[in-house]
Amino acid sequence: MRVILLGAPGAGKGTQARFITERFGIPQISTGDMLRAAVKAGSPLGLKVKGVMDSGGLVSDDIIIDLIRERIAQPDCARGFLFDGFPRTIPQAEALRDAGVSIDHVLEIAVDDEEIVSRMAGRRVHAASGRVYHDLHNPPKVAGKDDETGEDLIQREDDKEETVRHRLALYHSQTKPLVDFYQRLAATTGTPRYTRVEGIGSVSEITARVQAALA
């Protein structure tokens, strides 16, 4: 099973990625992890990546595609793989296709923006312990205070509404064309399949939808 997983920040993609990788016995591949591993391994491609990163440049799509081809040739990808965070753009999707990397399924975890803002902007954290609360879904016993220590809770920068909305706008501007690309591909060639899974509900309900989509 070769899967591309799409979903906005806060859509619950990480939870479903874990389910998919465990269910199908496939690795989760992210470009960030792949770049770091290549640099650490010191392969010819890794040295090229290191040179680009050390000079403050952006690693080109060509290099990333080469890394992907190298990565998916490894034994743990024999049964497939899950791409998380790649491709992000149409040129990357086209380069992936042109490189002969076949994909079985593109899965989008879809959640309304206002729901994501509510999920993320309502989070509060106890900095010292990492305990996480939510104003609506898991409130502390005393508003703004950690249950165990009574210390103040904070809101992380990433969880502030303005930041969340900015990240969502960026995601939509990048991903909407990608969604259209894969929907057209599915309609005209039948592969990869494209499924939009509703990401609202309990974790078990969403997981059941994902499982049904990939069946």
From Swiss-Prot:
One of its GO terms (cellular component) is cytoplasm. The keyword Lyase does not apply. This is Adenylate kinase. Pathway: Purine metabolism; AMP biosynthesis via salvage pathway; AMP from ADP: step 1/1. InterPro entries: Adenyl_kin_sub, Adenylat/UMP-CMP_kin, Adenylat_kinase_CS, Adenylate_kinase_lid-dom, P-loop_NTPase. ATP binds at G10, A11, G12, K13, G14, T15, R123, V132, Y133, G201. It is found in: Cytoplasm. Consists of three domains, a large central CORE domain and two small peripheral domains, NMPbind and LID, which undergo movements during catalysis. The LID domain closes over the site of phosphoryl transfer upon ATP binding. Assembling and dissambling the active center during each catalytic cycle provides an effective means to prevent ATP hydrolysis. GO terms for biological process: AMP salvage. GO terms for molecular function: adenylate kinase activity; ATP binding. It holds the Pfam family ADK. The gene is adk. It comes from Azotobacter vinelandii (strain DJ / ATCC BAA-1303). Its EC number is 2.7.4.3.
